[in-house]
């Protein structure tokens, strides 16, 4: 499931438990606590995302893609279950 770059709405209860790949566009910056189903294994956030990921990413996520400025500030919050971490710039 991929959201457009201009999407920036609350996602709680909106994502199906059958989704395995979840990608948010550049403008998404909403609280994700309890919003990402445990079916998700691949997760991508856009450059504007600055919400807490600490204990908010399910342990099912093994592939995580984050904008580089986010990783520099909050690397210690990346779950240990993530085996593939990708940092990107514009």
Where are these regions (language model features)?
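Concave beta-strand-loop units of leucine-rich repeat
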Residues: 1-10, 23-31, 44-51, 65-73, ...
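Leucine-rich repeat
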Residues: 16-21, 37-42, 57-63, 78-84
């Amino acid at each position: 499931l991929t959201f457009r770059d201009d999407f920036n709405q609350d996602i709680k209860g909106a994502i199906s438990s059958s989704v395995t790949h979840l990608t948010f566009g550049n403008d998404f910056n909403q609280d994700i606590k309890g919003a990402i189903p445990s079916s998700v294994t691949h997760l991508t956030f856009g450059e504007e995302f600055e919400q807490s990921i600490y204990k908010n990413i399910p342990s099912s996520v093994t592939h995580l893609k984050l904008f580089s400025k986010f990783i520099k500030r909050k690397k210690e919050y990346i779950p240990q279950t993530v085996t593939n971490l990708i940092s990107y710039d514009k």
